[in-house]
Amino acid sequence: MSEIHVKTALSRLADKYLQNSKNPSVPYTIETIVSFFQEIIHSISPDTFQLDIDDILYKIYSKIPPEENNDALFSKLSNLVSRLKSQTVIHNKSQILYFLYLLSPISQSSRDVSSHLLDESISNPINIPSTEVESSNFGQTRYDQVPENPQITDWDEGLENESSISIAHDSSRLNRSTETSSVQHTLITEADLLSSISYVLQGISTEYVQFKNELALLSKRIPVQYLLQMRALSETGLLYQELKVFSNYDPSVSQSIDGDNVSKAFINDQSLALQSLKSVISKELTNFLALIASLDSQIRADASLEKPMVTIRRCIAWTQVAKLKLRILSSVVNDNMNQENKKRLIQVVSKYNVHGDPLIQELSDKILTEITGPLYEMIENWIYKGELVDPYQEFFVKEKNGSESHDHQGQGDVVWKGKYFLDKELIPSFLSEELVDKIFLIGKSLNFARYGCGDFDWAQEHYQKLVKKLSYRDPHSLETVVDKAYTESINHLVYLMEEVFHLTDHLKAIKKYLLLGQGDFVDLLMESLGNSLDQPANTLFRHNLTASLESAIRSSNASYEPEYVLKRLDARLLELSHGETGWDVFTLEYKVDSPINVIITPYCSRQYLKIFNFLWRLKRIEFALAHSWRRVNLGERNVFRNLDYTKFEWHFVSCHLAEMIHFVCQLQYYILFEVIEISWQELQLAMEKPNATLDTYIEAHEKYVTSITHKGLLGGGKSRNEDSFLHQLHDILKVILNFHDAIELLYNFSCSLSNRIRINVPISTDALAAQYTPIKNELSNFTEEFQVRLQKLLHGLASHKDPEMRFLSVRLNYNEFYVSHRRRHDKDVTSQ
């Protein structure tokens, strides 16, 4: 702008002032005021005009008294400054704004253009605000948020945003003197500050900036136009020092480092990922030092030039990218200080990878590539060898401590089901849940094949065939290797279970011999053991039971079973109790060992024992009823045909015996065909699926056993609960056995009476009635008790939520016999 234009603008400003003057009687002319304005302009230091508009605006804001309601003033001021910025014909906008600031009442160094001050101002040019105090006085600048809340929260606000790691500057804390000092001080120039920038960027104390712990103390001698710039550089130095202390921290050293708040948090929380992070930080700090060295050499070379090209503002611009990187690294470090994030460093860094800023994405990718190196090595050991190498417990696959003690319900061998588990909190976000499940299953399969099945050769072949270096930068290779390893390991494990360890053959053998599916074997065993099991339990010997078992095997189709099946079948006695018979303690067991016991677990074996005991008791009842039926039919034809005295009772017995046989046969049919066979078909379908795994086998077998115990009336409740179906069935079967014993008494009485009649022995009517009446009463009582208990069972089955249970109720009472019988009984009771 030419001198004429400047003078014209000042004249208009003076005229504007005179029009708005609060004291119009003062005889000042436009020329006098313009001369005053020119004196102000000439008295301003050239360095002052290097301030930009934002710095000057910040200074104006800081001078406005806070107790006033300044919202409207701030809004108006911002609007005017925006209009000033939009003027394209004005080039020296910042100088104009600073000049107007000096004229304003809020400027402590300005003079009011009024009354008696004007002459003094003209004769004594305006003083520039003092920028010097005693050299020992420093304004205190603090990183308040670094140790307390070090998260980078405002990345989207731009690179100049200072809110995340802020230097809290308080003008009252700086305590800059605005009064004219009687002692002349040396003015700090930009060249002086530039000479110390390389030290400030490293967090090293200088004459103008001192660093103490996490504090940066700025000298009050620093000119105001450089204050914000030096604060920005001091922030970079604090970031550098924080990261340097963290990267150099050695947990093996017991002594503490002053100000090392970050590193102290990691004394007992070292990990391979954390060590990799320290390596990344060390590399970035080395690059930053190279940048500082280049910057320092440029400053030194520029010092000899007449017109230096390097300024503090340019230094800030050149180090801005490096500063942002240091911010990100500091945020990562401080985020990981959270106790919940100690082992989740990869997850902490991963959230920066979805940021929209390319620089942040690039740095986070670089960090992730380094810190995921140990993770991918653990994955390689796991999917190639089935070995868990995790010295710092940071891998998402964990090994249970004391896993054997966790097998309270016998849920499987610890090699497969109780040894390893997934810690979902440690799963990185860039690995899908499906991929992690496959990785987990591959390692378990390899470990199980090696240590559970003893197949070391295949595990070595698997490693040599698939070995490939994995990394974060090549996720496709990881998916390809995992899919291939998953298919091979699962197929091989299924092959081992089926072909080498004969899993299906063992399940079929259990179905035949423990679930009484081999009819000829069961009948022969029942006949050979019948007389022995009638004896008291304490008179039985195991070798006698074993001999009967071997005899039944040789005499039935069981003799064609493979040797590895027959040698697992054994007879034994349960724990003896006083007064029990052999029927109460005899049982068959099928012994399984590793690795079959992973599927046929100890818990499942106990369930099989429970099922066998119930089916064996039901078979005993069937055997007893068949014997009673032969007694009735053969005796009626040969012995009791002409015996009128017991004819009515034998007819009564025949009717109710058929009723009990119907109940037992229908119950057996339901359990053997509707429950066991249907569940067996479902088990086979699950095991024959092309993608079936060992876990599929385990789940299918558990479902198979659970279905039998539940639908077979064995899992409706605790056995001691009077309302459970199992307890009711035991009571009904006990009544049937008592009825069978009463039939034996009636048969013996009838035979004795028939012989006495045949040989014409005198018979006393009273003596005969004394023997016969108790038998009649027992038969009647047992029959009535059977019907009452059966009706209660039918009522429970009919109201059960399971449709198959309701179907059993229909089978047992298909013609509503017990409903009509109950109506007749209630009618007879009412009539009496």
Swiss-Prot record:
Q: Which residue intervals make up region (Interaction with mzt1)?
A: 1-186
Q: Which UniProt keywords apply?
A: Cell cycle, Cell division, Cytoplasm, Cytoskeleton, Microtubule, Mitosis, Phosphoprotein
Identify the domain of life. Answer: Eukaryota
Q: Its principal location?
A: cytoplasm
Per UniProt, subcellular location reads as: Cytoplasm, Cytoskeleton, Microtubule organizing center, Spindle pole body
Pfam families with a match to the protein in the record: GCP_C_terminal (PF04130), GCP_N_terminal (PF17681)
Q: What are the record's GO terms for cellular component?
A: cell division site; cytosol; equatorial microtubule organizing center; gamma-tubulin complex; gamma-tubulin ring complex; gamma-tubulin small complex; half bridge of mitotic spindle pole body; inner plaque of mitotic spindle pole body
According to the UniProt record, list the residues that bear Phosphothreonine.
Answer: 286
Which GO annotations describe the biological process of this protein? cell division; cytoplasmic microtubule organization; meiotic cell cycle; microtubule nucleation; mitotic cell cycle; mitotic spindle assembly; spindle assembly
Under the heading Gene3D superfamilies, the entry gives: Gamma-tubulin complex, C-terminal domain (1.20.120.1900)
| MF annotations from Gene Ontology | gamma-tubulin binding
Q: What does this protein do?
A: Component of the gamma tubule complex that is required for the regulation of both interphase microtubules and mitotic bipolar spindles.
Q: How does it assemble?
A: Part of the gamma-tubulin complex. Interacts directly with mzt1. Interacts with mto1. Interacts with mto2.
| Alphabetized PANTHER family for the sequence | GAMMA TUBULIN COMPLEX PROTEIN, GAMMA-TUBULIN COMPLEX COMPONENT 3
What protein family is recorded? Belongs to the TUBGCP family.
How is this protein named in the record?
Spindle pole body component alp6
Q: What species is this protein from?
A: Schizosaccharomyces pombe (strain 972 / ATCC 24843)
